[in-house]
């Protein structure tokens, strides 16, 4: 019962982070940010963009597009 179940969002972001895959994050303002995911939690994503670290609130994100497709295989379970 203590086992935490991963959701698609966590699997997606964790795979992008582990593989250091470049992503484009689209914000609700229409702004685009390119970079690599360094970490995330329930409310935020840490992105490295051109050598600068950004803390982006998930409620401001509309879309995350990876450079290559991400496979939805949860190898940690």
Curated annotation (Swiss-Prot):
Q: Tell me the SUPFAM superfamilies matching this sequence.
A: Sm-like ribonucleoproteins (SSF50182)
Q: What cellular component GO annotations does this protein have?
A: cytosol
Domain of life of the organism in this record? Bacteria
Q: Does the keyword Ribosomal protein apply?
A: no
- A molecular function GO annotation: RNA binding
Q: Where is the Sm domain?
A: 10-70
GO annotation (BP), single:
regulation of translation, ncRNA-mediated
The protein's UniProt keywords, in alphabetical order, are: RNA-binding, Stress response
Pfam families, from UniProt?
A: Hfq
Function field: RNA chaperone that binds small regulatory RNA (sRNAs) and mRNAs to facilitate mRNA translational regulation in response to envelope stress, environmental stress and changes in metabolite concentrations. Also binds with high specificity to tRNAs.
- Quaternary structure and interacting proteins, as annotated: Homohexamer.
* Family named by the database record: Belongs to the Hfq family.
Q: What name goes with this protein?
A: RNA-binding protein Hfq
């Amino acid at each position: 019962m203590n086992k935490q179940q991963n959701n698609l969002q966590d699997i997606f972001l964790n795979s992008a982070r582990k593989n250091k895959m470049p992503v484009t994050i689209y914000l609700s303002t229409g702004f685009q940010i390119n970079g690599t995911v360094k970490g995330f939690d329930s409310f935020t994503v840490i992105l490295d963009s051109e050598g600068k670290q950004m803390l982006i609130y998930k409620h401001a994100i509309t879309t995350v597009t990876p450079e290559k497709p991400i496979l939805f295989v949860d190898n940690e379970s």
